[in-house]
């Protein structure tokens, strides 16, 4: 059973959605899931898979990005449709206190171990939550190394938008043109140490005539960039159009 626990995060506005904490089990990682309180539409809620960076975990977006508060506010303001957001732990090693955990995480990243788990994770989530099966309502995004994982999983997830926030990418893993391509929604800080890599990616996408949106914002490679970008990303992917 996926609903193993419920964490209520205090917010400055009336609580609407919940953060559901899912423990690691059956070879799948721990996850935090934002679930809206609104009535589920007939075709299911839109769904976003949202990944943390190499030093974070599955609670990073809820804590530092204030996911529940942000989404509650946007839904209350009728700025976006209600959406389910899945925030998994993106590495196979779960001990935060091991001395070399950054190195083992990097090893996981290079070998694509989370990517190997993801199809099973996705099937479990979408078989347990009432989410839309239409690719136009499925999205994937990540920050820093999580952006690399999101890019690698874009085809597996069959999503319509890939969010790349301060992406740290391997050029050999750049996407290739195909008949149906997602929109690559990219944002990075003006002072980000990896800004040059973002520019290189944009030039590549231009050359390949692949759809993308690129935004530079004030800040570096940190939550001062990622937290404010999240609501803009959500308004871009699930704007409320049936007013």
Segment roles from a protein language model:
Residues 1-9:
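Bacterial N-terminal signal peptides
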Residues 13-243:
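Non-catalytic cap/lid and distal C-terminal segments of serine-dependent acyl enzymes
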